[in-house]
Amino acid sequence: VIGVKNSSMPVQDIQTFASLGGDDHIVFNGPDEQFLGGRLMGAGAGIGGTYGAMPELFLKLNQLIAEKDLETARALQFAINGIIGVLTSAHGNMYGVIKEVLRINEGLELGSVRSPLTPVTEADQEVVQKAASLIREVKERFL
């Protein structure tokens, strides 16, 4: 084992794992909502469920961290968190919402989620549209 994904919310756990593992081990940040905090506390990278909906935003966030532009990084993390809040607000599963967002924003026909995940409902379409729009707006602002 050369690495671990930390999915707990306390970023101190990342610092602990990074300290114990040393330079020949890697810690991955799990919670997308704290990518910035996790990276600053020692995560070498991240593994996240929402990255697929907005990969350019997480790549930009990682770039801002490398450039030590923490003010802009914080603003982008806050904007990403707003998107995540919308992605998780539907009746359908977040991954179903992401598939619909990718259909709208990228023209990708990915189908629905499989059982036991709950598919997006007709009532969720407002949430899907809002998430897709927010991602486009945040890309325009930061990219």
Where are these regions (language model features)?
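Catalytic alpha/beta core domains of metabolic enzymes, predominantly
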Residues: 1-81, 87, 91
